[in-house]
Amino acid sequence: MNLLPLTFLFPLVGFLLLSFSRGRWSENLSALVGVGSVGLSALSAAWAIFSFHSSPPEGGAYSLVLWQWMAAGDFSTNFTLYLDGLSVTMLGVVTGVGFLIHLFASWYMRGETGYSRFFAYTNLFIASMLFLVLGDNLLFLYFGWEGVGLCSYLLIGFYYSNRNNGNAALKAFIVTRVGDVFMAFGLFILFQQFGTLNIQELLVLAPQKFPEGNLWLTLATLALLGGAVGKSAQLPLQTWLADAMAGPTPVSALIHAATMVTAGVYLIARCHGLFTLAPDILELVGIVGAVTLVLAGFAALVQTDIKRILACSTMSQIGYMFLALGVGAWDAAIFHLMTHAFFKALLFLASGAVIVACHHEQNIFKMGGLWKKLPLAYASFVVGGAALAALPFLTAGFYSKDEILWEAFASGHRELLIAGLVGAFLTSIYTFRLIFVAFHGEPKTEAHAGHGISHWLPLSVLIVLSTFVGALITPPLAGVLPESVGHAGGEAKHSLELASGAIAIAGILLAGLLFLGQRRFVSALAKSAPGRFFGTWWYHAWGFDWLYDKLFVKPYLLLCQLLGRDPIDRTLGVVPFSVRGGHNLLSLTENGRLRWYAASLVGGAAILLGALLLA
């Protein structure tokens, strides 16, 4: 376990070396440092995970105090690494999937300006996420939280010479900062009430000090939920994620699969004891997830950009995780987080291969017929898409998503179950719409398959993990998270499995019926009045950007214009202006004429005499 600090120190050192190189290193050397540092981190993590399983720590968790960070009066905080079943799972996902993404990126980014800078940012991204999941208190978690936010800004705006990319990065930074402010308020409340931010101490003290439904706990968990929805792109702070596709495709894979958007799920799961004492907020978590997964599913139906389709699918899949957390299916949420990392990384990396092969074309309707020219990318999309659609029994996504649906049913949340089934149907339609349109039909562009081990190896490994093989990896969460109500199954569970599987297959068949062949019905529907109305609405993500522009952006810009005219200084400027005006008037009396002075004396005396007589 003494190797545990190396998991985040290796990528941190990689970031420093690449930063100090200032782009003077060759691409091979930059790739060696950038990929190698994450590879060493993954090896360190593998050893830590092996040690955790082979020699289980007493109490099911291992703590390693590195140093005392701060001490002031009665307050002190140590920088301590905490490893239990939950952080072991996250450690494996972040370093394992992160390494595969870095390896693929070494191929994808060849020839790009800022090759070293790219790997410097991604190394810092991995280090920040590991800082987040290994810290034993919410303060250090928050530092990692802000670190991944900063890295997302840098990577989304990587092609900063394009103004739209800079705007997308700024939008992501601002929207997620809104959630971060809420989270900071939550930390203030918790520290004020308990005098500590150590997570394990909070989980012990909370039920001792407060009854279920306590106002302070409700406010604190609501604030933490605000932070989680911002970072995990859930309603109402989901608008940044689709625009985040402006960055390089491996960045999208990192954000969606291995790092940033899973942070909100991890936060709620890690603070599970606080949320169970605030049942109204826990219920709200499930509702937020259910609404998000349905709205994102409809939005994905009409997107034409291959990466934006996958971005909408990420919002939807994270919605399933929030739904699971909301019904108390803690294990199922983390299980789906893990399997989602496998197939979503696969889909994004495969989309990167397609984009490079098609000369950076991202519109799926300008592709077509790619299955013969890009067999590995096609296989990746078929397997990853099947896992995303939860094709029964063969894919990892089926087992994790089915567990969520069963827990929703077993806990009596029938409305959330219906939302999950609707989302499953939409997912299978939009996923295979992408596959049928991009890979089948008439070719519309020239495409050339990529080569090299850094291209095919990550895709091949993720293909295997996206099948049922990935579902065999069970997160060691026993004793870490509360046992869910639907832990045991039976006839009802098997029936639900068959129903959800049938829904997924029905969606795939419907997608084939609509998008293989002439697509006349789809074209006619899109041109109809209802089709244009809903298509525009869904394409623009239900109009949230328009609404926020009217409610927040335009009033803010108007306020900036008003303040730019300096109204305060102008108002205060009336005083010196009046004094100067009075002085100028009085100075007119100093004209050097004796008659004027005599008249002034007589006039002044008359005024004084009149005042005395009137008094």
Annotate each language-model stretch with its function.
Residues 36-53, 179-189, 382-389, 458-473, ...:
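Hydrophobic alpha-helical membrane-insertion segments
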Residues 2-5, 21-120, 193-214, 239, ...:
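Transmembrane helix-loop-helix hairpins at membrane boundaries of multipass inner-membrane proteins
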Residues 448-510:
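Hard-cation-handling environments
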Residues 74, 82, 480-495, 520-615:
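Aromatic-capped, Gly/Pro-kinked transmembrane alpha-helices
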Residues 38-47, 99, 187, 294, ...:
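Hydrophobic core of alpha-helical transmembrane segments in multi-pass integral membrane proteins
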Residues 1-9, 25-32, 75-93, 131-144, ...:
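Membrane-entry segments of alpha-helical transmembrane domains in multi-pass membrane proteins
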Residues 86, 92, 96, 100-141, ...:
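Hydrophobic transmembrane alpha-helices and their helix-loop junctions in integral membrane proteins
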Residues 390-396, 401, 469-480, 604-615:
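Juxtamembrane "helix exit" motif at the C-terminal ends of alpha-helical transmembrane segments
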